Design a protein with these regions (language model features):
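Extracellular/periplasmic envelope-modification machinery, especially enzymes
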Residues: 140, 232, 292-301, 306-307, ...
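Membrane-interface helix/loop caps of multi-pass membrane proteins
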Residues: 1-331, 345-349, 644
Length: 645
């Protein structure tokens, strides 16, 4: 279900498969430790960690190195490859979950081909601590199945679940609560403990056999309900995670009974997928991400093909890497340590190579020196992306040229950076001073988002700057669909009381409410031009795709790719927001609206390129060429707003 969820074909709540995995993992590891304790009266930690090294490290090393290699061809050298390199390094030390928690980049959370390794990091962090605790219990003469041990585990689980609930609901007891609830190991531990407690329970007695079939059926229905109805608006993990967690626990507990349902679950196709599940999980997401990049117009077929291809790669990994190493009895003691060193050093060394190649290798120097690419990262873009195009800064503050008593000020999130060239050109042409202040991932809203620590601080800075500059025209641009359709963890807009939206329609109501509060505040006392979000592009990195197909000699594919238009209907959430905003702004005389679709699109389709050059540098941000196409439209909107020709 996780794989189908990632393909986008089915199961909006397929992410609950990870929670099922945590329960199963807690159960399996506890059974192994209980068996060892019963046979030897102790837990040999060195043997345990040696087995984990042989089981986990070789396969994840193979997948990480393979992903790094493919990223050279399928990801942009302008920041994305660095993100993958950093993720690979964090994943090598099983710290990917902390890495993602600390990131503010939408791309790092949404489209990173190593994003899925956060769950492996959580599992290994649990494995690092739990056996040690059981070892300490053993030294204290506490049996694993004793009442005291069970009560201690239940207390920890209740605490973990409680904090998870509050964090998932956005409670500010810790920074970036929604992200911490999702990625934080302490708030996932209760899911493992449920599996541990099932392992500590005696097998279901025969007198309960009559319950097996209905309980298993109900559990399967509950799982299907959760994967079908949960989505990005579900406050997760929180209380919602209890459905897949306890359903999985019941399936494990009653699964030993021979019923029609258990025999179906144990059928050969499911057994095969179970055997390759670890490597399949490691490989499916990177291949899906790369399929989206190389075949952007194929939203369903390419990801499905990638998922099927990952089955073959996973089978190869199982037969040639996992099983030979895991079953090698000669790999003991110091040899296991050497294996661990090799598995850690290899992706670290390869990540260094990819980092170097992203600036010097495989023809990418030519790509970086391409005039079109350079134009996409102008002086104004350096304000957003740092001193070099690989170093993204979180905020921008800049004032340049023009008459001091007439100022156009541009504010917003990263979307504002994509329009900085156009608005700066309008200011220059009409003798305005131009000022900017925008923060990556922080939209201009009355209620600052909680998923980033600094959004409230940036909003306060922006407000201070607006009051200080007192602009003649305030230009606002947000990538609105990111905050309305649940595209990012914790990024969904809330109402002024902090209430989370249940779906995108309620989120849209909150978005309009926030606009209403903003427009009635003293922030927008000036004339205001709202630049609405451009339609989405199907191509994540068009220039890189052009280079990719040129490298493999498929020039026809390049030409066809750049001739393709994208349907305006593909931006349905964006279109819904644009309509609602326009309706609201009619009520305010000091507000003008400019929709980039009026330049990019006809009634049905939108251009992604002009004269062979891309208008987008990713799926949603305009290149300088795309931005400058907006100059006339923005000029007319501002002229009408301030009654100037």
């Amino acid at each position: 279900m996780v794989v189908l969820y990632h393909t986008g074909v089915a199961f909006s709540g397929g992410y609950v498969g990870v929670d099922m995995f945590f329960v199963i993992s807690g159960f399996v590891i506890s059974q192994l430790l209980i068996r060892e304790t019963n046979e030897t009266s102790r837990i040999n930690l060195l043997n345990f960690y040696g087995r984990r090294i042989k089981r986990i490290l070789p396969a994840v090393t193979f997948a990480t190195v393979g992903t790094l290699f493919l990223s050279i061809f399928a990801l942009s050298p302008f920041g994305e490859q660095k993100q993958v390199v950093d993720t690979a390094r964090a994943s090598t030390f099983f710290a990917a979950n902390f890495y993602f928690y600390l990131q503010d980049s939408y791309w790092a959370l949404a489209e990173n081909p190593l994003r899925h390794l956060w769950s492996l990091a959580v599992e290994e962090q649990f494995y690092l601590v739990f056996p040690v605790l059981l070892f300490i219990f053993g030294k204290a003469k506490l049996r694993l199945d004793s009442t005291a041990t069970k009560l201690w585990l239940i207390a920890v689980a209740i605490f973990s679940f409680t904090i998870s609930f509050f964090l998932s609901s956005g409670s500010q007891i810790l920074p970036k609560p929604e992200l911490f609830a999702f990625f934080g190991t302490p708030w996932r531990i209760w899911e493992f403990i449920v599996g541990v407690l099932i392992a500590l329970m005696p097998k279901s007695p025969k007198k309960l056999n009559f319950m097996a079939t209905p309980v298993i059926a109900i559990s399967l229905v509950a799982l299907f309900w959760s994967v079908s109805t949960f989505d990005s608006f579900t406050m997760f993990p929180g209380s919602a995670a209890a459905v897949p967690v306890f359903s999985t626990a019941l399936l494990i507990y009653f699964g030993n009974n021979k019923t029609v349902l258990t025999q179906l679950i144990c059928a050969k196709p499911f057994t095969f997928l179970g055997n390759i599940s670890y490597s399949w999980y490691l490989w499916h997401w990177p291949l899906i991400v790369f399929a989206h990049r190389v075949f952007p117009a194929s939203e369903k077929i390419a990801p499905l093909v990638a998922a099927l291809l990952s089955v073959a790669v996973a089978y190869f990994s199982l037969r040639r890497i996992e099983n030979p190493i895991r079953r090698n009895e000669e790999l003991r003691g110091k040899r296991v340590i050497r294996l661990a060193v090799v598995c850690i050093a290899t992706p670290l060394a390869f990540s260094l190579g990819v980092q170097m190649l992203s600036t010097t290798g495989l023809g990418l120097t030519e790509l970086r020196n391409n005039s079109t690419i350079r134009a996409s990262y102008s002086e104004m873009r350096n304000c957003q992306f740092g001193t070099t195009i690989d170093q993204q800064s979180d905020e921008c503050e800049k004032s340049i040229f023009g008459t001091k008593n007439r100022t156009i000020m541009l504010v917003g999130d990263s979307g504002a950076s994509a329009f900085s060239d156009a608005v700066a050109q309008v200011a220059k042409d009409n003798d305005f001073q131009f000022a900017t202040f925008y923060a990556n991932g922080c939209p201009i809203t009355y209620q600052p988002l909680t998923y980033r620590i600094d959004c409230a601080e940036n909003f306060a800075k922006m407000r201070s700057k607006i009051n200080e500059i007192d602009p003649s025209v305030l230009v606002v641009m947000n990538m609105s669909d990111l905050y309305v359709d649940g595209s990012g963890l914790g990024a969904i807009i809330r109402d002024f009381n902090g209430t989370a939206a249940k779906d995108r329609y309620e989120a849209l109501d909150f978005w309009v409410l926030n606009w209403n509060l903003l427009l009635k505040s003293d922030i927008f006392k000036a004339k205001v031009l709202v630049i609405q979000q451009p339609p989405l592009s199907a191509m994540r990195e068009p220039i890189l795709l052009q280079k990719f197909f040129a490298l493999i000699g498929n020039k026809t594919r390049v030409e066809r790719l750049f001739d393709e238009e994208v349907s305006l209907d593909n931006s349905d959430t964006r279109n819904m927001i644009v309509k609602a905003e326009a309706e609201l702004f009619k009520n305010y005389k000091n507000i003008a609206v400019f929709d980039p679709a009026s330049v990019l699109c006809d009634a049905q389709n939108c251009r992604q390129t002009l004269n062979g050059e891309p208008l987008y540098y990713d799926g949603r941000h305009l290149t300088v060429k795309g931005s400058l196409l907006m100059v006339d439209g923005i000029t007319k909107a501002i002229a009408q707003l301030i009654d100037e020709k």
